[in-house]
Each structure stands twice: as C-alpha cells, then as structure tokens.
Amino acid sequence: MDADSINSFFLIGALLAAVSVLLSPMSSRLGIPILLIFLAVGILAGEDGLGGIQFDDYSTAYLVSNLALAIILLDGGMRTRVASFRVALWPALSLATFGVAITTSITGLMAAWLFDLHWLQGLLVGAIVGSTDAAAVFSLLKGRSLNERVGATLEIESGSNDPMAVFLTVTLIAILANVDTELSVSFMLVSFIKQFGLGICLGLGGGWLLWKLVNLSKLAEGLYSILVLSGGLIIYAVSNKLGGSGILSIYLVGLFLGNKPTRGRHSILNVLDGMTWVSQIGMFLVLGLLLTPSDLFDILLPGFALAFGMILFARPLAVWLSLLPFKSFSSRDRWFISWVGLRGAVPIILAVFPMMAGLPGAQLYFNLAFFVVLVSLLIQGASLTTAARLAKVELPPKPLPISRSGVEIYPSSEWEVFVYCLSENKWCVGEPLKRLSMPDGTRIAAVFRGDKLLHPSGSTCLEAGDILCVLGQERSLDALSHLFSQAPETKEVPRFFGDFFIETDVKLADLAPIYGLDLDEEASEMTVADLVASELGAHPVIGDHFQWQSLHWVVAGLHEGKVTNIGIRLPPET
C-alpha cells in the first residue's frame, strides 16, 4: 500500500466516521437504534450504495469486529454493578445456556424448512443467530430506568451467552466440514465446560491480577486506561488461545475492575466510553460495507418468515422455558425479556466462521444472519421504549446530577464531585445553606451563580439557576439528587408507585381501618415488610408489585436489599 492509498484510506474512514456521528441524532428523532444508523452508513458507502466501495475482506471484518466487541464488553462489565447479580445471575445463566440452545433448535428447524437445507445446516443458521448481542443490548438499555431484575438479566445474559453460541457454531461447522466426524456427547460436554470454565477462571483470575497491577502502578493518569485496555485484550486473547471464551473472560475482567476500588477508575471509564463509541461505529461501518444489499432480495420473503419466527415464537418459548424455575419474574417481565432478544454484531461475526472455513452455502448463512440482525434492530430495537411501557417494567426516571467526576486522592477513594443545577421548583431555592439537611459525609464545595464563584457559608441563600458542586460518595447519590435535582413530573411517580407511600415497619393492623383491610389473626401480627416478603420472596427490587385485598402494592424504596417504602394504589372505584 503506497502513501496515496494510505491517505485515501484515512480520508474515507474519517469521513464515514464523521458522517455516522453527525447522523446519530436522527436515531432519537426516528425512534430507531443508533447502531442501525452506523450500519446504514456502511451499507450506503458499500458496493450497492452511493459510495460504491467494494469490500469483501472477511478476515479484516472478523478482526475489527472481535476487537470492537472485546472493548464494548470490557466497558459494559465495568459499568455493571455486582449487586445486580443477586437478583439476576441464575436467570441470566439459564437464558445464556438453555435459552440459546432452545432458540438455536427452533430457529434451525425453521431455517431448514424455509430454505430447503439439511437439518444440520439449519441448526448452524440457528446457532449463528441464537445469541443476543452485548453491543446492541448495552447500547439500547444504557440510560433507561428499568426494573433492576429485568435490566440486569438482559445485560448479564448478553454478556455471557456468546460461549454457548460459539460452541454450537464451531461444533456444527466441524461436523459439516467433515461428514465422517463423530463427536461424542462426552466430547461436546467437555468442550462446552472448557468454554465456560476457562472463560470464567481466566476472566476472574486475570481481572484480579490486572486490578492489583493497576493499583500498584504509579503512572500518568491517561495511561491507566491504556493498561486496563491492553490487559483486558491480553486476557481475551489468552482465553481464546486456550479454548475458553474470550468474550466471557473480558466481560468478567471489566466486572471485577468496575466493582473494586481501582486507581483512576473514573478516568478509565471516561476513556472507555469514547473507545466504545469508536468501536461501535467502526464495527458496524465495516459490517455494513461487507453487505451487498442486492443479495438479500433473493431471501426476502423466507428471510422475513425466519426473523419473525425467531422473534415471535423461538425466543419467547426459550425465555418462558428457561425462566420456569424463577417465580420472581411476572408474565410482563417474561414478555419484555422475550422482546429484547436483540441481535447485532455477534451473529454477523459468527456468520463469518463458515466463510473462513469454506463451507458450501456459507454466503447464504452470512446473508441470513445479516437479514435477521436488520429486522431485529428495526423491529425490536425501535419498539423498545413502547415495549417497556406496555410491559410496565420502566420505572419513573431518577433525578441525577448534570455531571459527576471522581476525586481520586488514593487508589481506593470513593469520593466524587456531583454537580447540580437548581430549578425553580426546588424547595431549597431562597433558603440559606444552614437549613439544608445534607446527607452524612457530604459537603457543598462550591456554588456558581452565573459566571461568578461564591464562597458558600451557612448564610448563603440559594437561587434558581445556581450550580452546586457537592463532595460525596455514591451511597449518598439518591439523597443528594432528590435534594437538588430536577424531579420527574409530579404525576409520573403516583401513576407508577401508587396514591400513598408507607414505611414497611408499619403493622397491617394499623392500616386496616384506613384501607378497609380484612385481616385474620395471623395477618394482624404482620408488618408491611412481612407481607412483601411473603408475596415477593427474598430479593424484591424497586417496581415489583402485587395485588392483595383489592389494593395494588408497589415496592418504592430499597436500602441494602431491604424494602423500606411501598406505594399503595387504591382500586379504581375508590
């Protein structure tokens, strides 16, 4: 490649990236996933599009996609709270194993029938599109206030279901490439355990080593993110080389680092956020360039049948069967999880495997995977907000600071600066600072009024539009945000949580005359907390609800896993 070719490559790549960024606001206006914008730019620049760029280098696409996916999973792992595993780990693992196997089987049989394939070829198609995509799920769920059990289940599932899909895809390719191959059940079981076992061990072990290395190193601030990124990729590559799941390993590395006091954590997350965007843009641009849209016309009708069969039948059945042992999921939860079986980059990456193995019909597998991904992003991704509202798994938005940054004075520092802008409707406007009931361990460090810095004292009166810089820790975030942030609309919280709020240490007998409860002797001795435990089990989350004695009860507050407040909605005729 000469200098002119290199400059042309830089020019085209930068132009496509810039166009993708500038067009990204269209996603919210059109109600479509932003990943679809990136993919569309790549397709339009490709062979059948306006750009006319001919790109059919599957090896390069495989390299770029794997690198991008590794970075996205590292970032996603660092942003996942390990506390969410308390309510979502086992359901997510059930979906990541049994769910993928069921989806693969049903989708594979449909593909074999629709495209007149051998049943093994059909199963290969099912395996390729059988797993949800972490990049798509993390991207579309980021910033959404969902029921914790549902949101965490979807995120953990998407970060851990790729080993099953990779295992099934590689196994079926081996059988189809050599029809004389005899793969025993024991061999397949060992391979499966190896994928998961090595992936988990190397992810957690490597995460611990990398965490120690980061905290023991004294580097320039910008280098910590490079160390984490390179260390994560080393563990990803080693896991893959040894036959484990690199995808699972790097997700667990991120999970370990994100839930430990890590030096430079906030700067690492800021850098990874930018790297994740670059990865998503680069990956979907390359995958878009790889597609020749005219090839999809030949599979249009059966392709739609396959995609909708998977979305409306295979995925829901897999979810309902996989979640049968978990009674904490309501029917609405299960329907929403079924609908958010988003397909993205992973099926397309897996579809490259048969191309690189030289299997007959590999181009059909690739086109089918791409078609299913397009339909999934267009239909499921675009309707995510509506689905969450209909399933009632979306919580009222929490008030948040306009920005937050870490104060990393020592490796395990958890101090942060939260920045709030006071709106006119906050009760503290016009009040002196000494009248504020600040949470323990917090302090107002600075007050900005216009472009002036005030020196806050107890007599400083707050005004609408003031910018407050508050020093505190994450555990105080909810209390601070309710004190200073713009709250949700007043009608929104009662609509979701109910008409009245009560604390859970109140006895049901005290509520009986107010709400007309008919209590037996046992119920008369119960508190609201006892009622919640008997109705919802050991691990309730905010937004969980149940019907009892004609009243609708909704969990409205939690502290350290225990329900502190509950909302009560009266029956319509009351």
Swiss-Prot record:
This protein's name: K(+)/H(+) antiporter NhaP2
Biological classification of the source: Bacteria, Pseudomonadati, Pseudomonadota, Gammaproteobacteria, Alteromonadales
Presence of the UniProt keyword ATP-binding in the record: no
Organism: Shewanella sp. (strain W3-18-1)
Start and end residues of each RCK C-terminal domain: 405-486
GO biological process terms on file: cell volume homeostasis
A single GO molecular function term of this UniProt record: flavin adenine dinucleotide binding
Family membership noted in the UniProt record: Belongs to the monovalent cation:proton antiporter 1 (CPA1) transporter (TC 2.A.36) family. NhaP2 subfamily.
Keywords: Antiport, Cell inner membrane, Cell membrane, Ion transport, Membrane, Potassium, Potassium transport, Transmembrane, Transmembrane helix, Transport
Short name of any one Pfam family annotated for the protein: CorC_HlyC
Gene: nhaP2
Record NCBIfam families: PRK05326.1-1, PRK05326.1-2, PRK05326.1-3
Known catalytic reactions: K(+)(in) + H(+)(out) = K(+)(out) + H(+)(in)
Transmembrane segments: 6-26, 30-50, 58-78, 87-107, 109-129, 173-193, 196-216, 219-239, 242-262, 271-291, 299-319, 335-355, 359-379
Function (record text): K(+)/H(+) antiporter that extrudes potassium in exchange for external protons and maintains the internal concentration of potassium under toxic levels.
Localization per Swiss-Prot or TrEMBL: Cell inner membrane
Major place of residence: membrane
